[in-house]
Design a protein with these regions (language model features):
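ALDH superfamily catalytic-core signature
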Residues: 204, 245-388, 450, 498-499, ...
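Conserved C-terminal structural/oligomerization subdomain of aldehyde/semialdehyde dehydrogenase
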Residues: 39-46, 210, 235, 273, ...
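Short, structured beta/alpha segment
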Residues: 1-101, 281, 359, 404
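Short, well-ordered beta-strand elements within core beta-sheets of diverse protein domains
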Residues: 45-50, 64-71, 158, 272-275, ...
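Rossmann-like NAD(P) dinucleotide-binding subdomain of oxidoreductase/dehydrogenase enzymes
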Residues: 135-282, 336, 407
Length: 512
């Protein structure tokens, strides 16, 4: 890491956090990781070897801290999260600036992400979420009650993504800590400095509360460290956000651990359908926002736009003009930039190769995605019209390339929406509730929106997908479900029970 970046954002040099102490990464035995400014790739933000050996120590520290942490009262754990909330609010600009520098998206979005960290605490402590892990008692019969109480899973591995390097892992560890789990966090190797800043703030919150050392740990690294972490026998659960290919490998590696929860929030090939009675201006704005927000680097971005033939000649040119006029530039620009650079040079190359592949398969370029003639991983929006979508050719492109297909009716729109292995988000634009209700009933997706884009989500609601998009709802309001498990107890309250028929028990056997 450059000295400038270190001085501006981090307290410690590049390090892992193990049992409350930051261990310098210098001289480590793991793969070297590096992050650069995507708008100015010659500027290195973070560069260091990693330490695979720290993974076992971090898991052991989390295991050691678990009894004391889970044994604390709910109020004590809430107090730590409230302090975390205060620290993230006080450091929101610092967090946002570092995300811009390391990930590249526009600063307004980065600041929104930084402010959402504290909001997740409020949501998790709200009745819609907290009620899902609140103990309760029910009468079972005349003499017995049934208790339901919740226990933490134990040591949870949280593996974060690069596109929302603060918000998404925070969405896992806030409910996990609340319910008494301990954490080993591995940030994306594309945003390690952001991960370390969050770890520094979390450790400060824990230290100020007198929490046990090892409640929250962090290990930096790439695939080698992630594989070591997810294979560690001391892990009780894995909360992962990332691609289908990596999520599949994690799931396969845990087939012999049926008791270990593996919650995967993966990618999407998300459709948006525009019907003839839609408000077309609204549909254009929402589809463009959802397709190109974060330079196409959201799992909920609209990848496939399905347009009814009756309005195709109006919608498609308007959408293409909107895409062509989106302002692309550095995330910290004072201009009203909509899209920043892609996170890596490889990401930029893959987006352009994806566009070429669509053309090679018969697609027609309506808006040509190109690299900007300037330093940085900048790619302009692309729009490609295809004849139809098929499961066989369905691929998630994590970049600013939108595909458009024309359909003749709602039946075909539903069929085309379902022509995917994914099932994360979908949108329908129509004035009729009945049209949306049918679309909702027949489309396979975890999030189905009406007259708003696929990229809109709220932590107050469940979030997750089907198929290649994931296996649980580890984000949003239902995230607590995957951080604690219910335990049932039958409680006799009526004293000595009468023996059942066929069993003889004499009172005299128990005389002193």
């Amino acid at each position: 890491m450059t000295q400038t970046a270190s001085e501006r954002f981090l307290t410690a040099s590049p390090a892992n956090l193990v049992a409350g102490d930051f261990r310098p990464l210098a001289g480590g035995d793991g793969d070297t990781i590096q992050s650069v400014d995507p708008a100015s790739p010659d500027d290195v933000v973070f560069e260091s070897p990693t330490r695979r050996g720290d993974v076992a120590d971090a898991v052991a520290a989390a295991r050691s801290a678990l009894p004391a942490w889970s044994g604390r009262s709910l109020e004590e754990r809430v107090a730590v999260l409230r302090r975390w909330q205060e620290l993230t609010k006080a450091n929101a600009d610092r967090i946002a600036d570092l995300i811009v520098l390391e990930m590249g998206k526009v600063r307004g979005e980065c600041l929104f992400e930084a402010n959402a960290l504290g909001g997740k605490v409020d949501i998790t402590l709200g009745p819609e979420s907290l009620s899902r892990v609140t103990d309760y008692t029910v009468p079972v019969n005349d003499s017995r009650d049934g208790d339901c109480r919740f226990k933490p899973h134990g040591v949870m591995a949280v593996i974060g993504p690069f596109n929302f390097p603060a918000h998404l892992p925070n969405g896992h560890w806030v409910p996990a800590l609340l319910t008494g789990n301990t954490i080993v966090f591995k940030p994306s190797d594309k945003t390690p400095a952001t991960g370390q800043l969050l770890a520094e703030l979390m450790q400060q919150a824990l230290d100020e509360s007198g929490a046990p050392k090892g409640v929250f740990n962090m290990v930096q690294g790439a695939a080698d460290v992630a594989s070591t972490l997810t294979a560690d026998p001391g892990i009780d659960g894995i909360l992962f956000t990332g691609s289908w290919s990596v999520g599949r490998r994690i799931l396969e590696a845990n087939l012999d651990h049926p008791g270990r929860i593996v919650a995967l929030e993966l990618g999407g090939s998300n459709p948006a359908v525009v019907m003839p009675d839609a408000h077309l201006r609204q549909a254009v704005i929402e589809c463009a926002r959802a397709a190109f927000a974060t330079t196409g680097q959201r799992c909920t971005c609209t990848r496939r736009i399905i347009v009814h033939e009756a309005i195709a000649d109006t919608f498609i040119p308007a959408f293409c003009r909107t895409a062509s006029n989106l302002l692309v530039g550095p995330g910290d620009s004072t201009d009203p930039v909509f899209m920043g650079p892609l996170v890596t040079e490889a990401s930029a190359r893959e987006a352009l190769e994806f566009q070429s592949g669509l053309v090679g398969a018969g697609g027609s370029v309506l808006v040509q995605a190109t690299s900007l003639d300037r330093p940085g991983h900048f790619v302009t929006p692309g729009v490609v019209q295809v004849d139809r979508f098929t499961v066989e050719n369905d691929t998630e492109c994590f970049g600013p390339i939108a595909q458009i297909a024309i359909v003749k009716d709602l039946d075909e729109a539903i069929e085309q929406s379902n022509a995917t292995r994914y099932g994360l988000a979908a949108s329908l634009f129509s004035a009729e509730r009945a049209t949306f209700d049918r679309y909702f009933a027949e489309v396979r997706s975890g999030c189905i929106n009406w007259n708003t884009g696929t990229a809109g989500a709220s932590s107050k609601l469940p979030f997750g997908g089907l198929g290649h998009s994931g296996n649980h709802r580890p984000a949003g309001a239902f995230s607590v479900d995957y951080c604690a498990y219910p335990v049932a107890s039958m409680v006799e309250r009526g004293g000595a029970a009468a023996p059942p028929a066929g069993m003889l028990v004499e009172d005299g056997w128990f005389d002193a």
